[in-house]
UniProtKB/Swiss-Prot annotation:
Protein name: Serrate RNA effector molecule homolog
Keywords from the named record: Nucleus, Phosphoprotein, RNA-mediated gene silencing
Modified residues (Phosphotyrosine): 79
Biased composition, class Polar residues, residue ranges: 649-664
Keyword Nucleus: yes
Single annotated GO MF: nucleic acid binding
Its biological purpose: Acts as a mediator between the cap-binding complex (CBC) and RNA-mediated gene silencing (RNAi). Involved in innate immunity via the short interfering RNAs (siRNAs) processing machinery by restricting the viral RNA production. Also involved microRNA (miRNA)-mediated silencing by contributing to the stability and delivery of primary miRNA transcripts to the primary miRNA processing complex containing drosha and pasha.
Organism in which the protein naturally occurs: Drosophila pseudoobscura pseudoobscura (Fruit fly)
Biased composition (Basic and acidic residues): 8-33, 40-49, 92-103, 341-362, 405-434, 442-487
Length: 951
């Protein structure tokens, strides 16, 4: 008990051991006398004045310790830094992941991104700036982890100057500060790439292999959508609908038709769009508990289904045969009898509805008893066979006679059964003739089928019986019986087919007609929280075990959500989606709570846009913009060309002019049907001469406004372009946005914005402002994505493949001794480095290729002008001086009343002022905060009025 008491007392005070461990040795142990106890946390029991001195409390009681021993005699010593008077700051923990998320070295000692060198360099620079008199602010600490929300704060020019020599020149300072900013940006790109390069979403964007596969997959989706659009355009479906909010039902029908076609549906499946009320009622009844008897009464079944239901119990639960010792012959014979029984059951269960089934079962029981008695005699005769050979010969003759009797009895029973079946068949045929218009029940259909097969079965059974009499051994008899059963089944199959052919007009036609499938209606689950390390394949493997699973969509991560992602899992409409959602909520994937909830159906699929879009001038402008967007997107994905999908490259002058709309024509060089003859609708027309002659001016129209002028021909051209963008490229023109990864979402064509109700009048200023602002909103689709040039990515730290391969070889060439070199990749030793180099290129070629791919991977990330990265730290962003409320060290300057005077040289350092040409103060020359005090103004009331007043 002494040990346990001591252990309990020690653990009782260990709650904050980790937090105090870092400063215990500095603060407490240095001030304690040498002769004092040095155990620190291990001596809490000795420091407790209410406990005994021994471990178990049995020693002499100790005196109450003098706490001055921990500080030493006299006044407390003041150390140089005030940071020792306070505990260290609280250690923050990340929400997910362990450590900084950076993987270990993949290539041995080869560090391609120089992460350790970056960290050491910038930690030393930041620590050089922060002197020992002040701790570094939390916002300026170097942050290494890859899951932070912002980049670490970059030193401004004043802070950077504090780290340099006082005698440095201005030009040298600016040169070094420019280098510091460039290196700082390179470090942030390096850290972000290393933190996310193993994640699936990052590989799909920039990996040399995964990005190509993803692009080809997206191109396949677009080609499929293009084929569907062309089909609908040719059959007139696209031309018969208007992108107007008043035609919402027609728009929804077109979108649903596209979805059914994309899912592989046929024209028969499109009929479900006309049966929406009926389909909704059926769906509402599915989750409810329905009485199975009512369903059986209302829905007729085919003979095939009835036969399958009868045979199910024979296959579902087979008997497990126990292994017995060889000597127990009786039990083994019985097991063999059970083993032989199942193949005969299909023959015996066919006349299941006939009356004499109890008599058949009684005869079978008698046969089984005879077999058991006979085989018991066989086992006893086998045991006594060693005594006399005559007894064994007599037992074998008895066995053959009993087997013959058994076979005769068996076939006599079958003959009686066939006669009964014929009688039942005649009765059934008579009943069927009476009820000509009535529906034939499945039970009445089965018996004529089996009666038609009876003559063949009887003939084959007699022939097999003769062969069984001639066979001398029991094993041969068993084989022939098994063969007979197979022959009976094979002979019964064509007979049943003929019998089914007779009742085809009644039942089979109903069974073969497939109802239209509502392939545009789905059920889905929304995953609110997916860690970046979770892959799409893992979610698919988790959800594919549920029936009705279709696809999975995962969104790109968001920096404000710590790179966590959202996901959508799509199922068919007829599944119990709440049960699946409950099952997913009870599971964790990579220790991540996915947060699964049921995704609701879309509330409003057609949403109105500004009604001014129906005006003729706006429509003509929209046709221009739509045509430019269509050309850019078609060229990006090579939809109407046979060439392979090419990556975006730096735009040339000719491409830039075409992108800006200054090209010679639209549609002349394109095979896209929606761009054919598009230039005929882009030429504006106006009666300028007539207005000039009649003296009509536009000022009067501007004051009163002009009514909305509609041009149906222009609107039909615009509608084709808008629907092409929406169906093929998932671009909602009137919402100036793109719906990403729509082919993997639950609704593949869900929402569309259409022209809303038009106003009565509109002024020309409103038209011009609307056209100009709308073009700015669509700028992301009008401009081509141009990658950075080689010179630009070199400034960002681009890598050379040959240089990195050479570094990889050097890192894996280690000298052990003279003429003794080691290759860490294989552990082999060589006489010189040239042999290791040859060995690496011959035996570890996949490692070298991986280094080259890694270089290309990193350079692809740098080339993207829209690359994902952490936002800049708020302290690094330039702000007006009025917003700056902290000094350079992160401390708030002293506050003053509005009417009080500022202290001397207040603007020199604390507000960024100062004298001289550089405006840089000397390093750390300000007084401590406690020395700053407010100057009290004094005014002598007896002084004359014209004297100077100091306030």
């Amino acid at each position: 008990m002494a040990d346990s008491d001591d252990e309990y007392d020690r653990k009782r005070r260990d709650k904050f051991r980790g937090e105090r461990e870092s400063y215990r040795t500095e603060r407490r142990d240095e001030r304690r006398p040498i002769g004092g106890a040095g155990g620190g946390r291990d001596e809490w029991s000795e420091r407790n004045p209410f406990r005994g001195g021994g471990a178990g409390g049995g020693g002499a009681p100790r005196h109450r310790p003098d706490y001055s021993d921990y500080r030493g005699p006299g006044p407390r010593a003041r150390y140089g830094s005030p940071v020792r008077d306070m505990p260290p700051p609280k250690r923050m923990r990340s929400d997910w992941g362990d450590g900084d998320g950076r993987p270990g070295p993949r290539y041995g000692g080869y560090d391609p991104y120089l992460m350790q060198a970056w960290t050491d360099h910038y930690q030393s620079m930041h620590s050089a700036y922060h002197h020992a008199s002040h701790p570094p602010p939390v916002r300026e600490l170097p942050i290494i982890g890859g899951d932070t929300l912002t980049q670490p704060a970059m030193l401004n020019l004043k802070q950077f100057l504090d780290t340099q020599d006082e005698n440095i020149s201005d030009s040298e300072v600016m040169r070094k500060y420019t280098e510091y900013k460039t290196d700082f940006k390179r470090q942030q790109l390096n850290e972000f790439f290393v933190a996310h390069k193993d994640e699936e979403w990052f590989k799909n964007k920039y990996h040399p292999e995964d990005s190509v596969n993803r692009s080809e997959e997206q191109r396949g989706f677009l080609r499929r959508r293009t084929d569907v659009f062309v089909e609908l355009l040719e059959n007139g479906t696209i031309g018969s609908v208007k992108v107007d909010s008043s035609h919402g039902d027609a728009l929804i029908r077109v979108l649903d038709t596209c979805v059914i076609k994309l899912e592989g549906g046929t024209d028969e499946d499109l009929k479900v769009l006309d049966e929406k009320p009926k389909e909704a009622l059926v769906f509402d009844r599915k989750p409810e508990s329905v009485d199975p008897t009512t369903v059986v009464e209302n829905t007729p079944k085919s003979p095939k289904k009835e036969k399958e239901e009868d045979e199910l119990p024979l296959i579902v639960s087979p008997q497990r045969i126990a292994l017995k010792p060889v000597n127990s012959d009786d039990e083994n014979w019985d097991d063999a009898e059970v083993e032989d029984a199942p193949p005969k059951k299909p023959e015996e269960e066919e006349p299941k509805e006939s009356e004499p089934i109890p008599e058949i079962k009684q005869k079978q029981k008698k046969e089984k008893k005879k077999k058991i008695k006979k085989r018991k005699r066989n086992s006893s005769s086998d045991e006594e066979s060693s005594s006399s050979e005559s007894e064994s010969s007599s037992s074998s003759s008895e066995e053959e006679e009993e087997d013959d009797e058994k076979l005769k009895a068996k076939y006599d029973v079958e003959d009686g059964l066939r006669a009964e079946q014929k009688a039942e068949a005649e009765k059934d045929q008579a009943e069927a003739a009476k009820a000509k218009l009535g529906s034939v029940s499945p039970k009445e259909e089965i018996s004529p089928e089996k009666s038609a097969a009876d003559p063949e079965v009887e003939g084959e059974a007699k022939e097999d019986g003769k062969q069984a009499e001639k066979s001398p051994k029991c094993d041969d008899e068993k084989k022939q019986e098994n063969g007979d059963a197979a022959k009976v089944e094979s002979a019964a199959e064509p007979a049943t087919g003929d019998a089914q052919g007779e009742v085809k007009p009644v039942t089979i036609d109903l069974d073969k007609v497939n109802p239209p499938r509502a392939m545009h209606r789905t059920s889905s689950i929304f995953l609110r929280n997916l860690a970046p390390s979770i892959t799409k394949a893992e979610i698919e493997a988790l959800c594919s075990r549920f029936s009705g699973y279709l696809r999975t969509a995962i969104a790109d991560p968001l920096v404000e959500r710590r790179w966590y992602r959202r996901g959508w899992i799509t199922f068919t409409r007829d599944v119990n989606i709440k049960e699946i959602c409950w099952s997913l909520n009870n599971q964790r994937l990579r220790d991540c709570e996915m947060g699964a909830i049921v995704n609701r159906d879309l509330s409003r699929r057609v949403r109105p846009a500004n009604g001014i879009t129906a005006h003729k001038q706006v429509v003509r402008s929209d046709i221009k913009l739509c045509a430019r967007i269509v050309m850019n997107l078609d060229e990006k994905f090579k939809l109407w060309s046979e060439g392979p999908l090419s990556k975006p490259s730096p735009a040339s002058d000719s491409e830039a002019t075409a992108a800006n709309g200054s090209g010679s024509s639209y549609g002349f060089n394109s095979k896209n049907p929606v761009l054919q003859n598009i230039t005929d609708y882009l030429i504006e027309e106006a009666s300028a001469e007539e207005e000039e002659l009649l003296g009509l001016s536009g000022d009067r129209k501007d004051g009163e406004g002009e009514p909305i002028e509609r041009d149906e021909q222009l609107l039909s051209v615009l509608d084709r372009l808008v629907l092409y963008l929406r169906i093929v490229h998932s671009v909602d023109y009137y919402n100036h946005c793109e719906y990403p990864y729509e082919d993997e979402m639950p609704n593949r064509c869900g929402i569309i914005h259409a022209r809303g109700p038009a106003p009565s009048r509109v002024t020309s200023n409103e038209l011009n402002e609307y056209i100009k602002s709308y073009e700015g909103k669509l700028l992301q689709f009008l401009t081509k994505t141009a990658l950075l040039s080689e010179d630009q990515i070199k400034d960002l730290g681009a890598k050379n493949a040959d240089t990195e391969v050479e570094k990889f070889v050097q890192a894996n060439t280690q000298e052990l001794a003279k003429d003794k070199w080691l290759c860490p990749l294989s552990g082999k030793k060589f006489k010189g480095p040239e042999f290791i180099r040859k060995h690496i290129f011959n035996k570890h070629e996949e490692k070298v290729d991986e280094v080259r791919k890694e270089v290309q991977y990193f350079n692809n990330y740098l080339r993207d002008p829209k690359r994902p990265q952490l936002p800049e730290h708020p302290g690094s962003v330039k702000r007006p001086e009025t917003e700056s409320v902290r000094g350079p060290g992160g401390y708030r300057p002293p506050m003053y009343t509005p009417m009080s005077g500022m202290p001397y040289s207040f603007g020199g350092h604390m507000m960024g002022g100062g004298r001289g040409g550089r405006h840089f103060p000397p390093a750390r020359r300000e007084l401590p905060l406690e020395h700053h005090r407010r100057l009290v103004g004094y005014h002598d009331l007896d002084a004359p009025s014209n004297s100077d007043i100091f306030d």
